[in-house]
């Protein structure tokens, strides 16, 4: 399990003395690896000592300077495939990281734009991107996001998270990315696509069973 945080540029630069110790506290208390988004070059070196995985958001996956700066920290880099990219285009993204001396790369599938306010998950993208030699992660909650679907904010269809999670694990992935909250409808962000915390155990149990079956049969 990996827990996710979010570092905004304003918080990181202006108030990092207060914000960054939060990551240290999470690691100490929960004793699991910590992952966080980064949004600009300056954040990479600042955040890296406090986390285990630097995450490149989907919309920033083609920002060469950000990819290089993240790579130079030598941390594990989880780069999300842009909703606007074909899966075979991700080889160019990962090459920028590896050419910078870092092969600790994860690639995340999080859906593809399909008209207005919706995404679809093309499971073919998983084996296609896996051919590049890096572990593939499936982001089950952002894949059901409806960008701008509620007018002034994004919507989501959390009822499909479990279905897509099971499908991705059956195809074969290294990890599943799931956002959860004890009260998703009142979460600060991404609530409509989050899995309620009380339902997480059952979902994890399902996907672990499928994963064991897939690995047993060497799929």
Task: Annotate each predicted stretch with a short phrase.
Residues 14-35, 70-76, 126-136, 164, ...:
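Alpha-helix-loop-beta-strand connector modules within alpha/beta enzyme cores
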